[in-house]
Every structure is written in structure tokens, then in C-alpha cells.
């Protein structure tokens, strides 16, 4: 077939998820689109941000009040030593009650903020999933030819989840962290500008140190990830081909390769972990030197009555907490990059070109005859490479048209055009005298029944799967359809008969049995036009005979398109379309084609020579 599937590279392990640290191509544009999605929930969103700000503003007052308690205790102790009184426990009790109320209020606003932001992000995720689900029904089949299923699934699941989770955490965290920095700085300056200057000196030193360590460790982290990928790839390869490895005595080679990859992983891992592990103790060392300087300066200022003794404790608390929001902002920025990258992939999907809309006043036939006409049809999966050129054919109601050709010749192309899975480049296809574009897609596909080798059955009972062809069918109608398809006897051999539940991949029944069930489903739907895919040698002879009998019964009185694998079974077909490398090379019936002594004759003779 000419439509070579071009898989976009999946964005994560096995096509599911994004790579960590992936950045959006258009950060500003993507975030603008994202904010438009938040607009319906802007009240909750803004109230959530306001709650975050209020919570932080209340919280930053806490250390100052703690310092007042210490000052009160110290002052009371000094008064007692000097014989001027003692500690005022009533004042301390009131201050503690105030402190408790402040922290409780801050927690309440923080909880409310989390509840509101979680609601906004999940509502937005719900809205995106709903739009994506509606979008997927509008996409042409060509979209799925050009994009891997793993990549599409990743956009539906991982990207939306990443977007929801990171948006919930990053925006509110970033806002509250900015407010924390400003709040801590204001409170520190209110205590002493000299101590604030002393505390801020150590921050550039810590940042320089972190940058040096990160630069040194980065190459080892890259090597670690590369080695980890080699180890994982080797293990997956060896386990999936374990039988072949043992059959060819490849265990020693496999172990030798694994040891080589594992040694590389060990070397790069311990170096990267050692260097990254140095950051915390070194930054703590610089931070502690800064705290010592703050304490000495604070003691000096206390002696000179510039600050109270409790202010030293308050200032140290602010200093220790000051670097936390800085690191949170850094993490939030990285998270926002992930949010934008995930959102960009989601918006790319939502912006994909859709199928041409159905006509506003479609044709609805009460009695479908099954007359099909191809008129000067031109088509190519790639517009620059036409595979069907100026093809015309008239098929009477009830006639059988076989489509033959070697494997990969593109035999399903014609039936895909008939089902309007793809739009024609030129020409027209008519059913009962009406252009297929005059029908709705659902109306068109209701006229056509498909029985393909790759039989699609969903997780559920056999009865539910058969009724999929006609949801309103009674149990008796389902059973009659199963009998007509020669599958009723097989169903009764199962423990639960028609109520037997098929698993997700229908692996609890054979391929031939799956195809018999799809024949029964087609019988129940009772279409006037059929598309059939013959059984191949992958099923046993008895099942193949049953499938052929079922198909013969199904084709009676119906216009049928048969994708043929054995040319002996379609000698009596009214029309035969011969395809090779995606092109139609011959058209006629069996006798006409054999007289031409062309490609069909070679195919036919080759099959019988093999037999």
C-alpha cells in the first residue's frame, strides 16, 4: 500500500509521555491559549490566587510575633534579676493565642487556595479531554497514518495530566513565592537594614557555588541517562527474545554486553550523585557562616539597643526561609515549561485539520439497491503521488467485485475510498446514482458492512459484540444471525454461551472464531453493500471452510467487494480489479484477464505452481 505510515517520534518511554525538561516552541503563544481556557473559571482562579497571597501575608507576620514572645520573656527575666518585677505570663499567653490564630487563618486560606486551584485545573483538564474526544471523531484517517498511536494516546493522557498537575502547582506556588520573598524582605528590613545586608551577601555566593557544581555534574548526569537507556534497551531486547538467545547460546554475549553497559552506568551514576550531593552541605556551610555573621551583628545591635533580643530569633527565621521561595520559583519556572510543552502538544492536536463537513441536506434512501459507480476516480495518499488514476467502473446491484494483488499492493485503498475514509483527488463515486458526498458519513457507512481479517471485537459479552451491528436487535435475531454465519455451534460450546465475556484483545478465542463473529455481526446489520476480507492460511482448514461458507451466504443478493488472497475463490466474480504497488494495473473478469496474459495471469499461475 502506498500510504507509508510516518510515525512521529513518541515523546517519552514507549511512546507514552513527554521527556523531562522539554520546552515549548512558542511559550508565550501557548500560555496565552491556556489562559483563554482558564477564562470560564477566572473567578475561582483569581480568588485562589488572592487566597494564596493572603495566606502568605498572614504567615510572614508569625516569626515577628515569635520574636516578641522571646523579647517579653527576656525582658521579664532581666526585670526579675533587677528586682523590678517578673515575666508577664498574661501578655505571653495573649501573644501565643494571637500567633495560633494567625497560623490557623493562614492555613485556612492556604487550604481554600488549594481547593479552588485544584478545581480550576481539573475542570480545565475535563474540558480539554472532552474537546479532544470530540476532535478525534472529526479527524481524517490520514491524520492517524501520519501520527503514531502512542503519540496520540500520550497527548490524551500524559500531556493533559502533566498540564493539569503542573498548572495546579506552578502558578499558585510562583505567586505565593514572590509574595513570600517581598514579605520576608520587608520584615527583615523592618528589623534591621544592616542585618538584611549581611544576610543577602551569602545568596550570590551560594548561587555561584551551585552553578559551578551543576556545570561539573551535568555531563555525568547526561552520561548516566545515556547509560540507563542502553541498560534498559538491552534488558528489554534480551527478555523479549529470551528463547532465541537461549536457542543460539547467546547468554554469555548478553551478560558481557550487560556488564559493559552496567559498568558505564555505575561510573557515571556515582560521579553525578556525588557531585550533586555536595551542593546541599556546601550551601549549608555558606548559609551557616551567614547565620553566624547575622547572630554576631544582631548581638552587637542588641547591646547598643538598636533591636530587641527577640528580633534576632525572628530575623534568623526569616533568613532561613528566604531562600526557600527562590528555589520554589525556579522549580515553578521549570514546571511552567513542562506545562507549556504539554499544552502545545494538546493544542496541536486540537488545531489539526478536520474532515470535510457533511452536507446540510443529505440524501436518505429508504431502499438501498447497492449500485456502485466509480467515475474517473483519481487518488493518492500523497497528493504528489497518484496511485489510482482515472479509474471508472459500473457495478450492478448484487454483483461481486474482487480486488486482488500481492501483499502490500494496496487492495484496501478502493474500499477505503468507498467508505469515504479518504477524500478523492478527482472524480466521483456514486451509490444508487447519488454521489457519496451527498450522504452523511454515518448514513453512508450504515449502507456498507465490513468483515475484515483484523476482526475488531470489544471487551464484553459475545451477545453485546454481535448486537453492535444492530443495537435494537432482539436475542432471537442475534441467534439467527449467528446460525447463518455458522458460529452458533461454537458459541454453545463455551461455558456461558452468548454471555461469554471476551477479554480486551479477544485472545480467549481464535482468530478464525473472531472472524466468524464479525460475519454474524454483518448478517445482523443486513447491509446492501459488503466489504469482505478472505481468510488466510493463519486459520485452520475447518475454520476456513466455515468462514468461506459464512461469506458465501452473506454475499447472496448483496453488492460485494472481496479482498482476495486465493485467486481460485474469485474465479466467478463479476469484476476483478488487479492492483500492484498501489496502482490499478488491470480490470475485467477472470476469463478476460487470463486471455490478456498480463499481471493477473502471472499471479494466478504462480499460486497454482506453489500449490
Regions found by a protein language model. Give the residues of each.
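Transmembrane helix-loop-helix hairpins at lipid-water interfaces of multipass membrane proteins
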Residues: 45-109, 190-194, 305-309
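An intracellular "coupling" helix at the cytosolic face of ABC transporter transmembrane type-1 domains
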Residues: 40, 141-142, 160-167, 171, ...
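Juxtamembrane loop-to-helix connectors within ABC transporter transmembrane domains
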Residues: 30, 38, 70, 117, ...
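Transmembrane helices of ABC transporter permease
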Residues: 44-57, 68, 169-223, 294-307, ...
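ABC-type nucleotide-binding domain
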Residues: 351, 357-359, 365-611
Amino acid at each position: 500500500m502506498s500510504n507509508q505510515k510516518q510515525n512521529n517520534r513518541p515523546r517519552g518511554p514507549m511512546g507514552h509521555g513527554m521527556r523531562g525538561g522539554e520546552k515549548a516552541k512558542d511559550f508565550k503563544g501557548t500560555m496565552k491559549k491556556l489562559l483563554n481556557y482558564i477564562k470560564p473559571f477566572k473567578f475561582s482562579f483569581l480568588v485562589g490566587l488572592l487566597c494564596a497571597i493572603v495566606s502568605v501575608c498572614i504567615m510572614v507576620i508569625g516569626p515577628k510575633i515569635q520574636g516578641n514572645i522571646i523579647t517579653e520573656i527576656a525582658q521579664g527575666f532581666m526585670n526579675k534579676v533587677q528586682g523590678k518585677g517578673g515575666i508577664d505570663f498574661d501578655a505571653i499567653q495573649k501573644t501565643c493565642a494571637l500567633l495560633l490564630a494567625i497560623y490557623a487563618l493562614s492555613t485556612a486560606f492556604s487550604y481554600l487556595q488549594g481547593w479552588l486551584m485544584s478545581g480550576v485545573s481539573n475542570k480545565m483538564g475535563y474540558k480539554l479531554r472532552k474537546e479532544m474526544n470530540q476532535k478525534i471523531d472529526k479527524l481524517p484517517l490520514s491524520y492517524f497514518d501520519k501520527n503514531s498511536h502512542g503519540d496520540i494516546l500520550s497527548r490524551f493522557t500524559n500531556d493533559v495530566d502533566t498540564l493539569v498537575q503542573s498548572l495546579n502547582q506552578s502558578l499558585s506556588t510562583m505567586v505565593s513565592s514572590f509574595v513570600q520573598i517581598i514579605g520576608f524582605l520587608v520584615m527583615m528590613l523592618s528589623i534591621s537594614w544592616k542585618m538584611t545586608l549581611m544576610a543577602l551577601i551569602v545568596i550570590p555566593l551560594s548561587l555561584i557555588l551551585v552553578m559551578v557544581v551543576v556545570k561539573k555534574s551535568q555531563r555525568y548526569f547526561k552520561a548516566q541517562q545515556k547509560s540507563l537507556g542502553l541498560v534498559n534497551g538491552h534488558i528489554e531486547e534480551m527478555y523479549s527474545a529470551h528463547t532465541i538467545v537461549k536457542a543460539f547460546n547467546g547468554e554469555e554475549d548478553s551478560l558481557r554486553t550487560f556488564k559493559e553497559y552496567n559498568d558505564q552506568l555505575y561510573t557515571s551514576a556515582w560521579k553525578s550523585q556525588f557531585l550533586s550531593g555536595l551542593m546541599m552541605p556546601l550551601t549549608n556551610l555558606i548559609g551557616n557562616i551567614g547565620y553566624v555573621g547575622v547572630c554576631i551583628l544582631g548581638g552587637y545591635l542588641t547591646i547598643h539597643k538598636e533591636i530587641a533580643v527577640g528580633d534576632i530569633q525572628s530575623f534568623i527565621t526569616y533568613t532561613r526561609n528566604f531562600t526557600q521561595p527562590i528555589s520554589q520559583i525556579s522549580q515553578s519556572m521549570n514546571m511552567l515549561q513542562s506545562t507549556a510543552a504539554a499544552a502545545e502538544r494538546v493544542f496541536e492536536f486540537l488545531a489539526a485539520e478536520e474532515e470535510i463537513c457533511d452536507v446540510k441536506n443529505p440524501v436518505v434512501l429508504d431502499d438501498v439497491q447497492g449500485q456502485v459507480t466509480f467515475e474517473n476516480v483519481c487518488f493518492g495518499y500523497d497528493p504528489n503521488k497518484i496511485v489510482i488514476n482515472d479509474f471508472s467502473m459500473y457495478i450492478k446491484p448484487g454483483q461481486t467485485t474482487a480486488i486482488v494483488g500481492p501483499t502490500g499492493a494496496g487492495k484496501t485503498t478502493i474500499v477505503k475510498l468507498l467508505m469515504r475514509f479518504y477524500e478523492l483527488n478527482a472524480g466521483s463515486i456514486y451509490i444508487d446514482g447519488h454521489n457519496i458526498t451527498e450522504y452523511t458519513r454515518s448514513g453512508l457507512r450504515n449502507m456498507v458492512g465490513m468483515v475484515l481479517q483484523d476482526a475488531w471485537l470489544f471487551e464484553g459479552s459475545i451477545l453485546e459484540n454481535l448486537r453492535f451491528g444492530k443495537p435494537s436487535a432482539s436475542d432471537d435475531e442475534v441467534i439467527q444471525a449467528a446460525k447463518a454465519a455458522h458460529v452458533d455451534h461454537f458459541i454453545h460450546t463455551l461455558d456461558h454461551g452468548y454471555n461469554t465475556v471476551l477479554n480486551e484483545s479477544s485472545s480467549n478465542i481464535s482468530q478464525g472464531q473472531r472472524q466468524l463473529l464479525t460475519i454474524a455481526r454483518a448478517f445482523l446489520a443486513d447491509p446492501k453493500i459488503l466489504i469482505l476480507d478472505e481468510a488466510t492460511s493463519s486459520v485452520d482448514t475447518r475454520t476456513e471452510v466455515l468462514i468461506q461458507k459464512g461469506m458465501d451466504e452473506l454475499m447472496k443478493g448483496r453488492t460485494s467487494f472481496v479482498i482476495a488472497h486465493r485467486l481460485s475463490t474469485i474465479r466467478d466474480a463479476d469484476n476483478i480489479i488487479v492492483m500492484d504497488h498501489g496502482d490499478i494495473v488491470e480490470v475485467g473478469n477472470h476469463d478476460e484477464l487470463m486471455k490478456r496474459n498480463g499481471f493477473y495471469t502471472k499471479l494466478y499461475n504462480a499460486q497454482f505452481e506453489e500449490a
